[in-house]
């Protein structure tokens, strides 16, 4: 927990440090409980633990601080359903929640859907992967950091 004004209490010091160190175009993965976080992080991303937290509450807090990239097709991506789950008609209600939170953060672009192994490869190049306790299937989301318009100096 962080004892600072205006900082959501779900953001750990490690996560705040990672968000501050990220530059324009860097990505962070908010990973569900089934995601192979430790394996992916062996390829380079910083591993941050947020066990017990759901992704929507963490996403809401992160979006209060993290500017999203406006120069890309979509600054947010999820793992698309595998063909067998599509055939079964599996629903992903968590994506609607993500879209709502992104809209509240002034992101009007739609969620990009990445094929499973494409998502894993992109996660390997992320700045950090945050392991959460999210139990929803297909709950992983990648966010691309944008820039702040600080006006004239």
Curated annotation (Swiss-Prot):
Widely expressed in various tissues and cell lines, including kidney, liver, and pancreas, marginally in muscle and testis. GO terms for biological process: female mating behavior; fucose metabolic process; fucosylation; GDP-L-fucose salvage; negative regulation of neuron differentiation; neuron differentiation. Pathway: Carbohydrate metabolism; L-fucose metabolism. The active site is at residues 24, 69, 120. One of its GO terms (cellular component) is cytosol. GO terms for molecular function: fucose binding; L-fucose mutarotase activity; racemase and epimerase activity, acting on carbohydrates and derivatives. Substrate binds at residues 32, 79, 120, 138, 140. Signal peptide: none annotated. Its EC number is 5.1.3.29. It catalyses: alpha-L-fucose = beta-L-fucose. It is an enzyme of class 5 (isomerase). Disruption phenotype: Deficient female mice show reduced sexual receptivity, as measured by lordosis quotient and masculinized sexual behaviors in female mice. Display a reduced number of tyrosine hydroxylase-positive neurons in the anteroventral periventricular nucleus, a sexually dimorphic feature in rats and mice. Embryos at 16.5 dpc have reduced alpha-feto-protein levels and reduced fucosylation of alpha-feto-protein. Keywords: Isomerase. Disulfide bonds: none annotated. Involved in the interconversion between alpha- and beta-L-fucoses. L-Fucose (6-deoxy-L-galactose) exists as alpha-L-fucose (29.5%) and beta-L-fucose (70.5%), the beta-form is metabolized through the salvage pathway. GDP-L-fucose formed either by the de novo or salvage pathways is transported into the endoplasmic reticulum, where it serves as a substrate for N- and O-glycosylations by fucosyltransferases. Fucosylated structures expressed on cell surfaces or secreted in biological fluids are believed to play a critical role in cell-cell adhesion and recognition processes. Belongs to the RbsD / FucU family. Mainly homodimer, but also exists as homotetramer, homooctamer, and homodecamer. The homodimeric form seems catalytically inactive. This is Fucose mutarotase. The gene is Fuom.
């Amino acid at each position: 927990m962080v004892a600072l004004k205006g900082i959501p209490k779900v953001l750990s010091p490690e996560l705040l440090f990672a968000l501050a160190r990220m530059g324009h175009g860097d990505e962070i993965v908010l990973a569900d409980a089934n995601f192979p976080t430790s394996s992916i992080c062996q390829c380079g991303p910083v591993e941050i633990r947020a066990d017990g937290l759901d992704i929507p509450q963490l996403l809401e807090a992160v979006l209060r601080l993290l500017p999203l990239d406006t120069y890309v097709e979509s600054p947010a991506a999820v793992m698309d359903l595998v063909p067998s789950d599509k055939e079964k008609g599996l629903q992903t209600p968590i994506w609607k929640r993500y879209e709502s939170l992104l809209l509240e953060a002034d992101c009007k672009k739609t969620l990009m859907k990445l094929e499973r192994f494409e998502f894993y490869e992109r996660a390997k190049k992320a700045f950090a992967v945050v392991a959460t306790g999210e139990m929803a299937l297909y709950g992983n989301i990648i966010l691309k950091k944008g820039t702040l318009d600080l006006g004239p100096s």
